[in-house]
Regions:
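Noncatalytic regulatory segments and standalone regulatory/sensor domains
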Residues: 2-5, 41-55, 60-67
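Hydrophobic alpha-helical membrane segments, chiefly transmembrane helices and signal peptide h-regions
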Residues: 25-34, 64-65, 112-114, 210, ...
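Active-site region of chymotrypsin-like
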Residues: 46-59, 126-133, 159-237
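Short, conserved glycine- and acidic-residue-centered signature motifs
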Residues: 42, 108, 191
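Generic anion/oxyanion-binding catalytic loop in active/binding sites
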Residues: 31, 137, 217
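Serine endopeptidase catalytic core focused on the charge-relay Asp
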Residues: 55-170, 199-201, 205
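Secretory targeting and sorting signals
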Residues: 1-42
Length: 237
């Protein structure tokens, strides 16, 4: 009896595994890293006008406005605050995160100082921290004040408060000396407001250097920002 044979299935050896080279592994890791979602809780680190910086010697001072010169970023601040505050500035009260160093101080005579930001992990936009529901206030330029012009500031105590410029070229006497060329408004300040920046619309006008409470009439004096910008070749941006 002839029994038919079943057809034979050809045998193919499995392909040999391709070794994972170091170069290929590095490329694969880079691709997977790029596709991975950002770590939970990661937030952009920002310092705006109206934020507080902490000095190496103890005092803290409020940033007036951020400004630029080329690719470098700077902060305008009160001269009489920075004068006694040391060279190094930190973003935190524990003084562990250095963000800048004092570039120069003009006080008395004027009342402004310039801090050079040195920490690339932060951004320093031309915005003000308002503490209001609308968020940050965008500042796009600077100008000198004029009598009758509206002026506003967002303080930690009074919130957003506005008034009118009532005089320019005013003088204030400090124990350390006299400051000239200030302007004045009736937009009052209260303890806790700090040396907040003053603006009109999207235009930087000045830095508060002294003021009276709202209950006493609210005369507030400001250092104009334009002389400070011109002295260091800076622009608000």
């Amino acid at each position: 009896v002839n029994v038919p044979r079943a057809p034979l299935t050809p045998y193919h050896a499995p392909p040999k595994p391709v070794p994972l080279t170091a170069a290929f592994a590095a490329v694969l890791l880079a691709v997977l890293t790029a596709l991975a979602p950002a770590a939970a809780g990661a937030q952009e680190q920002v310092i705006r006008g109206g934020d507080v910086l902490y000095s190496s010697t103890g005092p803290s001072c409020t940033v007036g406005f951020n400004a630029g010169r080329g690719a470098e970023r700077y902060a305008l601040m009160q001269g009489h605050c920075v004068r006694d505050a040391g060279l190094v500035w930190y973003a935190d009260a524990a003084r562990t995160v250095e963000v800048g160093r004092t570039e120069g101080v003009s006080f008395p005579g004027d009342d402004f100082a310039v801090i050079h930001y040195t920490n690339p992990a932060f951004t320093y936009p031309g915005e003000l921290s308002s503490g209001l529901p609308g968020g940050a206030i965008e500042i796009t330029g600077a100008a000198g004040p004029s009598v009758g012009q509206q002026v506003c500031h967002a303080g930690g105590t009074t919130g957003l408060h506005c008034g009118t410029v009532v005089s320019v070229n005013d003088t204030v006497a400090y124990p350390e000396g006299t400051v000239f060329g200030l302007f004045r408004s009736h937009a009052c300040v209260e303890p806790g407001d700090g040396a907040v920046p003053a603006f009109s619309g999207g235009t930087a006008l000045g830095l508060i250097v002294s003021g009276a409470s709202c209950s006493s009439g609210g005369a507030t004096f400001y250092q104009p920002v334009v002389p400070a910008l011109q002295a260091y070749g800076l622009t608000i941006s």
